[in-house]
Regions:
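Residues in soluble alpha-helical coiled-coils and helical-bundle/repeat scaffolds
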Residues: 44-48, 113, 130, 134, ...
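Helix-turn-helix
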Residues: 6, 10-52
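Short, basic, alpha-helical segments at the C-terminal edge of helix-turn-helix-like DNA-binding modules
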Residues: 55-61
Length: 209
């Protein structure tokens, strides 16, 4: 792992533990177990550190998704995004609904458990981005990549308006994640419930059961 990535990982941990107020260069140095001044050497400003953290979150998310091939581009992808080489999710209804559901459920479950820290950091960054347009831009770009991944799968399955349907699907999943991690609800979804919820969501969004 590179030193900048190590520092960004420490920033993620710091955000999840101490929130935005607790994110300082010195706090990140301590979290990374590095000499004081290390974080500021690579990321001179707070904005640079935040930007690196957003980019690292996107990189870690992409590693959760194993490569999938043979998926043609869709017809209404988010502007400015191509079809990433890593899609991770098999084709949805019309090709393999169960495989898509299982893969999506595995990813979401991992983000609720081993990846929970990342989600907490993401929520901190999302709130901060409402006051920092430059940070908002980085988060939007990261989200567009995920939506393009799903849209490519929907397009391959012949779903109409794959970009819009993918945006809806990802938005609903974001809501599910937030409810489980930071929402007021206390019910924790089992793997079976998670699979059922995603299956129902997929059918509703694509119009295919």
């Amino acid at each position: 792992m590179s030193r900048p990535a190590e520092i960004a990982d420490a920033a993620i941990s710091t955000l999840a533990r101490d929130g935005m107020r607790g994110l300082t260069h010195r706090a990140v140095d301590r979290a990374a177990g590095l000499p004081e001044g290390s974080a500021s050497y690579y990321f001179r400003t707070r904005q640079a550190l935040l930007q690196a953290t957003v980019e690292r979150l996107a990189e870690l998310d992409s590693t959760d998704m194993p490569p999938s091939t043979g998926m043609p581009p869709g017809t209404d992808m988010p502007p400015g995004t191509g079809i990433p080489p890593r899609t991770g999710l098999p084709a949805p209804p019309g090709q393999d609904l169960e495989a898509f559901t299982a893969a999506a459920a595995r990813i979401v479950e991992s983000w609720l458990t081993s990846g929970r820290e990342r989600q907490l950091a993401r929520y901190e960054l999302a709130l901060e981005a409402t006051r920092r347009p430059e940070l908002r831009q980085a988060l939007v770009a990261s989200g567009a990549t995920i939506r393009a991944m799903v849209a490519s799968q929907f397009a391959a399955a012949g779903v109409r308006q794959p970009g819009q349907r993918a945006a809806d699907f990802v938005a609903f999943l974001d809501g599910l994640l937030f409810d489980q991690i930071a929402g007021a609800g206390t019910r924790k979804l089992t793997s079976a419930h998670l699979n059922a919820a995603i299956r129902a969501l997929l059918a509703a969004v694509t119009g295919r059961g």
